[in-house]
């Protein structure tokens, strides 16, 4: 893929979009939020489709296509955490049938005779309360831990977040002993680039969903006998939303391309993707609510799910300001 999808990628996108539309419709998302419907069958469907087998960095673009569509659908399964955070760290120990997540900060490791001891508290771990496997990143090494095996030693408390179908949890490790065989040798930095790309791609999908709903609304909502979409002020805001989404999408796919090609620019590309996605959600969030008016604030409107997913993405793995600062430091260092 250079500047646009080739025929195979377009077919892949259409296939994924069709499958997501059937497996994860808005009614299911609302059912999960309101009635606690179990999304496990949806996760199993993704596994059966083979989507969890895209754990090779070379398939980053294909994975990005899936993540964008799942972001658009406000996917309630652990796919994002599993494929963009856990799989890159698990390397050859990744099981495509099981869910997982990554613990990036807050946990330390120390030698405990012939094993290792893990201590500390990790805050706001995506799917930390329901993942079957944990990839724990410490200064000493990365450890792949079965959640079942340490169930009595790790406290997993789900946090209350504004996205009703998103699972975020605090994990506390108190002297958890893991064998030396749990250690893996993996490029943590590259894994983090994939995580950033994945989160950015999900945010792009959510922002596209917001834009789609807004365009549908301004075409059907009438004032003074005409659709409100015919007013120039409304058109300007919709155009700004479209430009922001396209910019964020381009940078997110650029990040996926650099990851797939093992390009040394992937660190900057991942940071630019996350920064652009954060800026995009800010603009799309504000304009989307304004163009919808009071209806956009109601629980009955599906707009809320996409808004919350986009905003939640900004709050994880560093916001736009943090990544812009990193990009600035990189360029300043290069000029010295």
In which residue ranges do the predicted regions lie?
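Alpha-helical interface subdomain recognition
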Residues: 1-73, 111, 193-336
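Short glycine-rich, polar/acidic loop-and-turn segments at beta strand-coil junctions
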Residues: 58-59, 70-71, 83, 122, ...
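Hydrophobic alpha-helical segments that drive targeting, anchoring, or assembly
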Residues: 59, 63-66, 75-88, 92
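FAD-binding core of flavoproteins
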Residues: 78-80, 88-208, 212, 216
């Amino acid at each position: 893929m250079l500047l646009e999808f080739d025929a195979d990628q377009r077919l892949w996108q259409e296939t994924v979009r069709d499958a997501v539309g059937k497996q994860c419709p808005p009614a299911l998302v609302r059912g999960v939020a309101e009635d606690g419907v179990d999304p496990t069958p949806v996760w199993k469907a993704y596994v059966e489709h083979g989507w969890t087998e895209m754990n090779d960095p070379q398939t980053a673009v294909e994975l990005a296509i899936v993540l964008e569509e799942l972001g658009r659908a406000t996917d309630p399964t652990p796919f994002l955490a599993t494929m963009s955070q856990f799989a890159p760290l698990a390397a050859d120990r990744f099981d495509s049938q099981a869910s997982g997540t990554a613990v990036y900060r807050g946990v330390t490791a120390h030698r405990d005779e012939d094993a290792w001891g893990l201590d500390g508290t990790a805050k706001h771990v995506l799917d930390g309360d329901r993942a079957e496997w944990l990839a724990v990143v410490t200064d000493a090494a990365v450890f792949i831990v079965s959640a079942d095996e340490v169930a009595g030693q790790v406290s997993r408390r789900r946090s209350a977040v504004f996205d009703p179908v998103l699972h975020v949890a605090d994990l506390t490790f108190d002297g958890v002993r893991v064998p030396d065989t749990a250690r893996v040798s993996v490029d943590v930095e590259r894994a983090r680039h994939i995580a950033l790309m994945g989160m950015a791609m999900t945010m792009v999908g959510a922002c596209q969903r917001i834009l789609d709903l807004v365009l549908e609304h301004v075409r059907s909502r009438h004032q003074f006998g005409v659709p409100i979409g015919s007013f120039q002020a409304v058109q300007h805001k919709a155009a700004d939303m479209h430009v922001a989404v396209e910019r964020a999408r381009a940078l997110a796919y650029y990040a996926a391309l650099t990851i797939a090609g093992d390009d040394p620019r992937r660190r900057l590309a991942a940071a630019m993707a996350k920064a652009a996605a954060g800026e995009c959600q800010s603009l799309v969030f504000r304009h989307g609510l304004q163009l919808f008016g009071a209806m956009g604030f109601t629980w009955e409107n599906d707009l809320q799910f996409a808004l919350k997913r986009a905003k939640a993405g900004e709050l994880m793995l560093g916001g736009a300001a943090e990544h812009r600062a990193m990009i600035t430091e990189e360029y300043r260092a290069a000029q010295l």
